[in-house]
Curated annotation (Swiss-Prot):
InterPro entries: UPF0324_pro
Localization, UniProt: Cell membrane
Record keywords: Cell membrane, Membrane, Transmembrane, Transmembrane helix
Pfam families noted in UniProt: Cons_hypoth698
Native organism: Streptococcus pneumoniae serotype 4 (strain ATCC BAA-334 / TIGR4)
Domain of life (superkingdom): Bacteria
GO CC list: plasma membrane
Family: Belongs to the UPF0324 family.
Signal sequence residues: none
Name of the protein this chain belongs to: UPF0324 membrane protein SP_0034
Covalent S-S links between cysteines: none
Membrane topology: Multi-pass membrane protein
Transmembrane residue ranges: 65-84, 91-113, 118-140, 153-175, 211-233, 249-271, 286-305, 312-334
Lineage per the UniProt record: Bacteria, Bacillati, Bacillota, Bacilli, Lactobacillales
Length: 336
């Protein structure tokens, strides 16, 4: 059986949903195409789940296309930007990432939340929302239901942050620099960071958008050490501390992601415009949308809602802790 005859129907279903989701995401950037894709897929699940000819293509899209998307995501990351954000913001970034991951670990231990779901919510909250979840899910062998739950939780707090952060920043009397750091570290998804920073700029005729975006992209670089650690940890669990294979400890798609980041950094330093990588970054985003479509089509919405109470609570705790941490660190280093 050829690849197309085996996978074509499922891939086509994901493609059609993704085109619609991409279009809707353009009109509602705070929500974003990946979230639309998951929810459209889940709404269609009861009607399409009986069509078994879709299964192979959905599995390919939710697994392989997601890995390809992560590799291409590397072309949007310039490692030299870590140094561009300056010494003042790196302590805030590292503190917020650390506190969210620690909370996720403790929460799953004390409240009996599924380890993989807690991990996805933790990395999504602390690093870069859907992109971090997309990179982490294949590494820890997360189920489609767990990915959908984590994305949904992150989406809720993204939208909430985009709506209330400009007002909260005004109430707290944050400076322009302080709000850029606040939005860049306490909002997960790039589109929501953009929405919050743009709203602030409209209020105060400032230029925080670029600074907030750089902080956000610097957070994204944490995907590299976090996924490598989780891959090693997952391999130890599966192998029961026996001899490990390098391919299992360091998945090839993560290594390719790192190489793509290094290549981007090198070429940019040699004078290549960042716009050169734009088509690859856009393709990465679209493949993530296709993967989310597949995950949605394989997820039972009713069952997910019934079991999502603890994950929402974890997302709320992580979100509040990140807000308090970034404000506290800004106070300590004299920005706030």
């Amino acid at each position: 059986m050829s690849f197309l005859s085996k996978n074509g129907a499922g891939i086509l279903a994901c493609l059609l949903i993704s085109i619609l989701s991409w279009y809707l995401g353009g009109f509602f950037p705070v929500v974003g195409a990946p979230v639309f894709a998951i929810f459209i897929g889940m709404l269609l699940h009861p009607f399409l789940s009986s069509y078994k000819q879709l299964d192979a293509g959905l599995t390919f899209s939710s697994k392989k296309l997601l890995q390809y998307a992560v590799v291409l995501l590397g072309f949007g990351l310039n490692i030299s930007q870590v140094f561009a954000v300056g010494q003042s913001s790196l302590p805030v970034i590292l503190s917020t990432i650390s506190i969210a991951l620690i909370i996720a670990y403790l929460f799953q231990r004390f409240f009996a939340l599924d380890t993989k779901l807690a991990t996805l919510v933790g990395v999504g909250s602390s690093i870069c929302g859907g992109s971090a979840i997309a990179a982490t899910a294949p590494v820890i062998d997360a189920k489609e239901k767990e990915v959908a739950q984590a994305i949904s939780v992150i989406f809720f707090f993204n939208v909430l942050a985009a709506l209330i952060f400009p007002t909260l920043g005004t109430w707290l009397h944050l400076s322009n620099e302080g709000f850029a750091l606040f939005a860049g570290t306490a909002v997960n998804d790039t589109s929501s960071v953009t929405a919050a920073a743009s709203a602030w700029d409209s209020l105060y005729q400032s230029n925080t958008l670029e600074s907030a975006t750089i902080v956000k992209l610097t957070r994204t670089l944490a995907i590299i050490p976090i996924t490598l650690f989780l891959s090693y940890w997952q391999s130890r669990q599966q192998e029961n501390k026996q001899s490990l294979q390098l391919k299992k400890v360091f998945p090839l798609f993560i290594l390719y992601f790192i190489l793509a980041s290094l290549l981007t950094t090198l070429l940019t330093s040699l004078g290549v415009s960042s716009s050169f990588f734009t088509p690859l970054k856009e393709l990465s985003k679209f493949l993530i949308v296709m993967a989310m479509s597949a995950i949605g089509l394989k997820t039972n919405l009713v069952a997910m809602v019934k079991s999502s109470g603890k994950s929402i609570l974890l997302g709320a705790i992580c979100w509040i802790a990140i807000i308090l941490t970034t404000l506290g660190m800004q106070t300590l280093i004299g920005i706030f």
